[in-house]
Swiss-Prot record:
The gene is rpmA. Pfam families: Ribosomal_L27. Belongs to the bacterial ribosomal protein bL27 family. GO terms for cellular component: cytosolic large ribosomal subunit. It comes from the Bacteria. Residues 1-21 are annotated as: Disordered. InterPro entries: Ribosomal_bL27, Ribosomal_bL27_CS. GO terms for biological process: translation. Keywords: Ribonucleoprotein, Ribosomal protein. One of its GO terms (molecular function) is structural constituent of ribosome. NCBIfam families: L27 (TIGR00062). PANTHER family: LARGE RIBOSOMAL SUBUNIT PROTEIN BL27M, RIBOSOMAL PROTEIN L27. This is Large ribosomal subunit protein bL27.
Amino acid sequence: MAHKKAGGSTRNGRDSESKRLGVKMYGSQVVKAGNIIVRQRGTQFHAGYGVGMGKDHTLFAKIEGVIKFEKKGEFNRRYVSIVAA
């Protein structure tokens, strides 16, 4: 016979690994082609001139230059562009 009563199990103790999302390079920083600028879920930031978007909505530099963040359009969307240096 057991000398201790069986303890119940907890339903806690899990957590997902962080995805390291966010802005990786900021305005007026110099970037090379291929540098990641923003990692995001969905389009919080839209791709402007000289910026490409990956299938997971990651924004990356297509040309070398200086990053420019701006709001424009009817819905005040945030765009990331690259100005050639």
